[in-house]
Amino acid sequence: MAFVLSLLMALVLVSYGPGGSLGCYLSQRLMLDARENLKLLDRMNRLSPHSCLQDRKDFGLPQEMVEGDQLQKDQAFPVLYEMLQQSFNLFYTEHSSAAWDTTLLDQLCTGLQQQLDHLDTCRDQVMGEKDSELGNMDPIVTVKKYFQGIHDYLQEKGYSDCAWEIVRVEMMRALTVSTTLQKRLTKMGGDLNSP
């Protein structure tokens, strides 16, 4: 039994490795992780959003860029990656640890990291030499500005409970948009090495 389990694990690792045949396909696992992260964010709710209405802010989520036809396939992958990386960075901070139930926060950060790890399998193959120029690509810059606005807001509000609640709701929107982008990539073929 242990041998069969070891063999199955080895097959999975080979299949998802850099040279593996499944390496650059968006998997169901990525979508399941995305859904689980949304559920965790929902469970992290500590305050009624209605009690924080005075702290609401429009962060300018670039939703139309992601959900519309503005992104080409070669832009969609780096935008998805950047959204997940910035989400992870937002929640993997000392300020965030003080604001949330640490068990749920750890689970969320782990889930975001799993999504990033899955995408890392493809990142070098998809982006390769283009990586430095993609960092300056308009959609990436837009995503970075969006998250910088969130960081600035939290700092301006002194990382208050209401500020974090507003950001939690906003991040649910952002991760929903990133899930939509994952679905679009899958419809584009899912094979991130194809043109």
Curated annotation (Swiss-Prot):
Annotated disulfide bonds: 24-122, 52-162
Keywords, ordered alphabetically: Antiviral defense, Cytokine, Disulfide bond, Hormone, Pregnancy, Secreted, Signal
Residue ranges of coiled coil: none
Other facts: IFN-tau genes are intronless. They evolved from IFN-omega genes in the ruminantia suborder and have continued to duplicate independently in different lineages of the ruminantia. They code for proteins very similar in sequence but with different biological potency and pattern of expression.
GO CC list: extracellular space
Pfam families: Interferon
InterPro entries noted in UniProt: 4_helix_cytokine-like_core, Interferon_alpha/beta/delta
PROSITE patterns: INTERFERON_A_B_D (PS00252)
CDD domains reported in the protein's UniProt record: IFab
Family per record: Belongs to the alpha/beta interferon family. IFN-alphaII subfamily.
Tissue-level expression: Constitutively and exclusively expressed in the mononuclear cells of the extraembryonic trophectoderm.
Localization (cell): Secreted
Signal peptide annotation: 1-23
Function: Paracrine hormone primarily responsible for maternal recognition of pregnancy. Interacts with endometrial receptors, probably type I interferon receptors, and blocks estrogen receptor expression, preventing the estrogen-induced increase in oxytocin receptor expression in the endometrium. This results in the suppression of the pulsatile endometrial release of the luteolytic hormone prostaglandin F2-alpha, hindering the regression of the corpus luteum (luteolysis) and therefore a return to ovarian cyclicity.
Primary gene name: IFNT4
Record-level GO BP terms: defense response to virus; female pregnancy
Example GO molecular function: cytokine receptor binding
Top-level lineage group: Eukaryota
UniProt protein name: Interferon tau-4
